[in-house]
Structure formats: structure tokens, C-alpha cells
């Protein structure tokens, strides 16, 4: 194992801080969505009453702080290192949901959290070093290579189909629609965020990158994708259980981001097969943890007041909401 570079260490510190804030923001925002939904049209039904709810804004501010830290992390470390550390936000989200929203975290959920930590640590210790970037134009050349252009086109087409065809029909019953939109757009967001973060870093170092039109195109992509992600993430949070949204969103978002980073930045080009395999094992470990969190989400929430365990059955829909968001047992939480 090579010694971690100073830039990678800075990236890890920022990414972990980001996870704490972002994981907390899920819970704070959902509390705001619940309070707003109790007195008006819910976000899942197209309402925007949450914009008047202080709890929702507190959650947004917390998320912004986390995203700023995450943004800065991409200026120092490769996406393959920074993005998987988002698993830590799942832990904070699940634990806070247990205590604040009363969305119970079973012992297998705790095991899932531990697996996420182990997998994240494995990736941190074996992550590739960031390639040297001297200008935003260098990133632009990577972005307009045929491979990444094809990837971007496929993402845009799939997202358009999800928004205009599947969301009106299945959005309220199939979580994968909302989460899919957020995750797919998120992979493009991360690539653009990394470009903007590096541009800011280089500008503060004395080389102004904002004189290039390329930088402003990356900023436009970030703004557009973020607006879409916030809108559909709000709908997902208002309709489905937070403890389910967080891990599934993480898995999809991280998978597509790693694919995008491999295509655009070719992060693994300088690594040995053993290191790549170790990083993949770390990622699979994280996926196992998120799977446990998802599949055992209803354990300990049975009707028995003594906390008997209700095992999920084979017929339990994995990516659907069996009833309306208002009637879900996990959402019956006092404001």
C-alpha cells in the first residue's frame, strides 16, 4: 500500500465532514417535509409548501454546508476516492432516523453500517493519486472525448424518459424512478463539480480559470443538474422511507459516478490489477452494507410493542411503496 498523498488526505477529511452534514440534512429536511405536508399539499403530490417551513430550510443549509465540503474534496482527490465515502452519510442518516423520525434501525442495520465503514476504509487506503491538472482546458479535452460524450448522451436520454414517461405513471409507487433521476444526473454533476472545484483551486493559486468559456459551461451543467436533483430528491423523501432512500440513492449515485470518472479521468489507468481488485472489493463491501440496511428496514417495526422481528418476505417489493406515502407505517411520525 502506497502512502497517501497530502491531497488525498485533505480530500478524505473534507469528504468525511461532508457526509456528517449531508446525512443529517436528510433527517432535518424530512422533518420539515412532514410538517409542511400536514398543513398543505405534500411535495410528493407536487406541493411546494415546504419552502415556508423553517425545518426544511435548516436541512437545506446543512446540506449546502456538506455539499461545499464535498465540492472542495473533489478539488484535492479523485472521484473514485471521494464519492464512495458518501456511505458514511448513510450511517448518520440511518442513526438519526432511528432516534428522531422513529424509523427503527435493527441490529442488521447496524451491521450494514459497519460494512459501509469497512468498505470505505478499504477504498481510502488503496485509492489512486489524483492526476496533475494544470488548466480547466485539460478537463474540457477529457470531457469531449468520444467515450464520455456517448456516456453523457445516454444519461440525458434515459433521464428524459424517466421524467416525461415513467415519473407521471410510477413515481409515487416506484422509488427507483425518483432515485434514478437523481443518481444519473448526479454522475454528470460530479464530473462538472470536479472541473469547477479545480478551476477555483487553480484560480486561487494565481492562474485565473474563469476567463475560459469552458469553466462557465461546467458551472451551467452543475446548476441545471442540481436543480433537477433537489426537486426529485424532495419528492422521494416525501414519499418513501428515509432509511431506504439513503442507501439506494447512494448505491446508484456512486456506481454511475465511478463509471463516469473511469471514462472521463481514467483514474485506474496507473494502478495495478491487485489495487483495482481491492478497491472493487471495498465497493462491494459497501454495497453489501447498504443492501442490509435496505432489506432489514422493517425489522423491529412490527405491531408487537415488545419489538419482535418481522422478516421481509420474498414478495415484499424492493423498489415500491405498497401504499400511499401518507399511509406508510414508517411515515406515521408525530411532527
Swiss-Prot record:
Residues 29-55, 101-104, 165-179, 234-244, 294-335 are cytoplasmic. One of its GO terms (cellular component) is plasma membrane. SUPFAM superfamilies: Multidrug resistance efflux transporter EmrE. One of its GO terms (biological process) is magnesium ion transport. The keyword Cell membrane applies. It is a multi-pass membrane protein. Residues 303-321 have a biased composition (Polar residues). It holds the Pfam family Mg_trans_NIPA. Residues 1-7, 77-79, 126-143, 201-212, 266-272 are extracellular. Residues 322-335 have a biased composition (Low complexity). The chain crosses the membrane at residues 8-28, 56-76, 80-100, 105-125, 144-164, 180-200, 213-233, 245-265, 273-293. Its main location: membrane. Residues 303-335 are annotated as: Disordered. One of its GO terms (molecular function) is magnesium ion transmembrane transporter activity. It is found in: Cell membrane; Early endosome. Belongs to the NIPA (TC 2.A.7) family. Homodimer. Acts as a Mg(2+) transporter. Can also transport other divalent cations such as Fe(2+), Sr(2+), Ba(2+), Mn(2+) and Co(2+) but to a much less extent than Mg(2+). This is Probable magnesium transporter NIPA1. It comes from Arabidopsis thaliana (Mouse-ear cress).
Amino acid at each position: 500500500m502506497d502512502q497517501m498523498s497530502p491531497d488525498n488526505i485533505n480530500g478524505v477529511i473534507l469528504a468525511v465532514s461532508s457526509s456528517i452534514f449531508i446525512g443529517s440534512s436528510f433527517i432535518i429536511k424530512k422533518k420539515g417535509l412532514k410538517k409542511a405536508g400536514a398543513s398543505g399539499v405534500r411535495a410528493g403530490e407536487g406541493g411546494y409548501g415546504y419552502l415556508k417551513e423553517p425545518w426544511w430550510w435548516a436541512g437545506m443549509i446543512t446540506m449546502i454546508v456538506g455539499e461545499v465540503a464535498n465540492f472542495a474534496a473533489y478539488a484535492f482527490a479523485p472521484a473514485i476516492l471521494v464519492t464512495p465515502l458518501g456511505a458514511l452519510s448513510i450511517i448518520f442518516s440511518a442513526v438519526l432516523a432511528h432516534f428522531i423520525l422513529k424509523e427503527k434501525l435493527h441490529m442488521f442495520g447496524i451491521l450494514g453500517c459497519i460494512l459501509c465503514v469497512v468498505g470505505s476504509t478499504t477504498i481510502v487506503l488503496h485509492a489512486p493519486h489524483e492526476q496533475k491538472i494544470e488548466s480547466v482546458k485539460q478537463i474540457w479535452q477529457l470531457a469531449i472525448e468520444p467515450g464520455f460524450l456517448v456516456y453523457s448522451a445516454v444519461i440525458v436520454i434515459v433521464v428524459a424518459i424517466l421524467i416525461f414517461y415513467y415519473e407521471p405513471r410510477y413515481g409515487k409507487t416506484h422509488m427507483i424512478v425518483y432515485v434514478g433521476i437523481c443518481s444519473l444526473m448526479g454522475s454528470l454533476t460530479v464530473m462538472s463539480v470536479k472541473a469547477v472545484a479545480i478551476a477555483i483551486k487553480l484560480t486561487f493559486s494565481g492562474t485565473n480559470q474563469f476567463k475560459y468559456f469552458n469553466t462557465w459551461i461546467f458551472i451551467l451543467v452543475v446548476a441545471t443538474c442540481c436543480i433537477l436533483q433537489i426537486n426529485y430528491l424532495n419528492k422521494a423523501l416525501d414519499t418513501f422511507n428515509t432509511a431506504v432512500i439513503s442507501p439506494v440513492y447512494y448505491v446508484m449515485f456512486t456506481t454511475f459516478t465511478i463509471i463516469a470518472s473511469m471514462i472521463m479521468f481514467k483514474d485506474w489507468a496507473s494502478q495495478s490489477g491487485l489495487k483495482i481488485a481491492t478497491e472493487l472489493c471495498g465497493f462491494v463491501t459497501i454495497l453489501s452494507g447498504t443492501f442490509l440496511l435496505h432489506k432489514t428496514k422493517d425489522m423491529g417495526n412490527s405491531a408487537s410493542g415488545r419489538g419482535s422481528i418481522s422478516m421481509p418476505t420474498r414478495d415484499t417489493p424492493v423498489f415500491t411503496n405498497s401504499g400511499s406515502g401518507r399511509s406508510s407505517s414508517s411515515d406515521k411520525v408525530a411532527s
